[in-house]
Amino acid sequence: MENQEKASIAGHMFDVVVIGGGISGLSAAKLLTEYGVSVLVLEARDRVGGRTYTIRNEHVDYVDVGGAYVGPTQNRILRLSKELGIETYKVNVSERLVQYVKGKTYPFRGAFPPVWNPIAYLDYNNLWRTIDNMGKEIPTDAPWEAQHADKWDKMTMKELIDKICWTKTARRFAYLFVNINVTSEPHEVSALWFLWYVKQCGGTTRIFSVTNGGQERKFVGGSGQVSERIMDLLGDQVKLNHPVTHVDQSSDNIIIETLNHEHYECKYVINAIPPTLTAKIHFRPELPAERNQLIQRLPMGAVIKCMMYYKEAFWKKKDYCGCMIIEDEDAPISITLDDTKPDGSLPAIMGFILARKADRLAKLHKEIRKKKICELYAKVLGSQEALHPVHYEEKNWCEEQYSGGCYTAYFPPGIMTQYGRVIRQPVGRIFFAGTETATKWSGYMEGAVEAGERAAREVLNGLGKVTEKDIWVQEPESKDVPAVEITHTFWERNLPSVSGLLKIIGFSTSVTALGFVLYKYKLLPRS
């Protein structure tokens, strides 16, 4: 075969070729190398990191314009980063967070804004309790096997929210909860998939929290260092600017071709790119029908990440920490976090433009986006200082042809039960990594490490270096970032929903009326 001759002549023979130089692909390559396996990583971009990307310049020192956050229970990425000599620091929430709704700012502390209306409180409480309870039915490694999988997969998350919530207040916040966590709209995503997504991130409180949650920490120096330091370890085993165009496993060895017509030969392939990008590669033989269908049906979320830098952290003058939850259709940003450096230098606020808003605001000039964001911060924080930033950075992930969007791919209704079970299934000697294939913290850097190392162990099993039972490995808890168990009060567990309250009121009214009738007509004894 001509390709085989080219590969042999060039001497490009490896045990494994990894497609994709993000955290998942590089985690796989690192583990394989530790077992003495010859590996080559082919990365399409001129950098490693995938959906993590640390920009460095004189204005910001360093800034994560992609994935950045880590927290308790994310033990694999914490172990890997520690091994690479990368430290974490806590995102600042020492001062008060703020909720902005209907043109007013409400300071608060804790994971979720407080609700003072008693009916709305019952609705909120029932919403979080219901999402968590439904999630308990869903196996993290096989959500399509949940008892109610077919029913829930036919529903959008909007339909489920509208079914659960009685008040506009709870419904509006629930829609925002979907936007923030998966950068897509409630009407776009399967209820089954979203319930699974929240469950495998530890539940509604863990996924949404800063303290003791998914956004507790960042890396000193930026998350891009994880991939960069693995690349340093691997040396010339990583090739940048090498988009893979062909994978041919029709012969004894697999032949890989890149866009610049270089050829590489290997025994196994690990595909560590977003599922939809697999469609850019020509396979021989063709991919199985279910895999081919799956990769056409998993769109990427939409987000523009925006960092606004100021001379000083003026928000702290009002005892605000910089975290804002913004419920306003006209507001460009939906949620913010303090992005000041751990030593207090370079004060900054990070904000996300999410889902429908990312699409809408991407059409505007960068300076107009910047102006709108500053005006919003001035309103929410009640300070004209917000109008005078010293620098602005942004990253529209929808423009990235080798990502397609961020944070992660999502499952529209009907896809998980029909095609989801093939997400990790090997195709011949091709194995699949990427955060979308993880079973815990999928969509995060943690999920990327889990998926990459699992795919590496699948290959190691094929090479006879590990047993099948060692493919899935339990990760011990991080001693440096221990998790605190999330508990709920008696009232949170037992308060009725709004509909439950109405039933109680209706029953009580009926009993009272019946008693009155019986008493009036002397059917009850009188004392």
UniProtKB/Swiss-Prot annotation:
Changing C165S: No loss of activity. Gene3D superfamilies: 3.90.660.10, 6.10.250.130, FAD/NAD(P)-binding domain (3.50.50.60), Guanine Nucleotide Dissociation Inhibitor, domain 1 (1.10.405.10). Residues 519-527 are mitochondrial intermembrane. The record marks C374 as: Important for catalytic activity. Changing D15E: In a breast cancer sample; somatic mutation. The modification S-8alpha-FAD cysteine is found at C406. Keywords: Acetylation, Catecholamine metabolism, Disease variant, FAD, Flavoprotein, Intellectual disability, Membrane, Mitochondrion, Mitochondrion outer membrane, Neurotransmitter degradation, Oxidoreductase, Phosphoprotein, Transmembrane, Transmembrane helix. GO terms for cellular component: cytosol; mitochondrial outer membrane; mitochondrion. This is Amine oxidase [flavin-containing] A. One of its GO terms (biological process) is dopamine catabolic process. Heart, liver, duodenum, blood vessels and kidney. Coiled coil: none annotated. It is a single-pass type IV membrane protein. It is found in: Mitochondrion outer membrane. The modification N-acetylmethionine is found at M1. The keyword Mitochondrion applies. The modification Phosphoserine is found at S383. Belongs to the flavin monoamine oxidase family.
